Amino acid sequence: MIDYFILDKEKKRLRLYDAYREDGFCKCFENIEKIQIEKNSEKEKQTRVIIIETKDSELPISIEIDKDNNIIGYSNLQLTQVGDNFLEYNKQLSELNLPQLIQVGDGFLEQNEQLSELNLPQLTQVGHNFLQWNNQLSELNLPQLTQVGDGFLEQNEQLNELNLPQLIKVGDVFLKLNEQLSELNLPQLTQVGHNFLGCNNQLSELNLPQLTQVGHYFIPWNEQLSKLNLPQLTQVGDGFLLCNNQLRELNLPQLTQVGEGFLE
């Protein structure tokens, strides 16, 4: 047993302990050729490293586990795509190295409690509930990301640094309930869904120069934002800027269509 998976050394396969669950992590280990388990060279860590060689890759995959067999580290240098619910129920992962990852499905690392930094330099597209409820994540760098689904980084209480320079389109509930983020720059963003940046109490600076369309409840219940300039915005839904008590300056030169409860 490792975490909630069964690693079968004889049959050379990894499967879920609960067959009724689905986890994209399992599909990263098809066509296994060799499994080797080693003690970590750093004695104080009291961890072990599982090294897996597959027929599909020249480079080995490594999984680090703690003394209780929880997965705390994962490195796969050639992985480009993962399916839904990747390590969704893992709570102890603190190191993740996926330098070639391009696309992920829904529920990616949804309930992780230890990951504090993450760099996915090639990632371009993610599904719903990406890194949702990750209480320790403070820095995230996704320089190639262009599109995200619903629930992106929802309720990440420690996130204070976010780099998404190529992001163009986001779904509903983007970055809701993020209590530490004070600045956000999304220079290429053009379209957002409902409840964008809801309840971000520390957000005081926001730059969205290309934004043209937003859904309902754009930046509701923000307590710090005093200035907002959206030079390309043409259309907004209901509840635009609901309960933004500190907003003093607003510039929307291209706006032509608004929903109900505008600036309520």
Language model region names:
Residues 8-9:
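Intrinsically disordered, low-structural-confidence terminal and linker regions
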Residues 16-18:
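Cullin-RING E3 adaptor/co-adaptor recruitment helices
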Residues 59-60, 67-80, 92-102, 114-124, ...:
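Structural signature of tandem-repeat unit edges
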Residues 76-77, 85-92, 103-114, 127-136, ...:
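Concave beta-strand-loop units of leucine-rich repeat
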Residues 22-93, 97-98, 103-105, 127:
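LRR N-terminal entry segment and analogous cap-like coil->beta motifs
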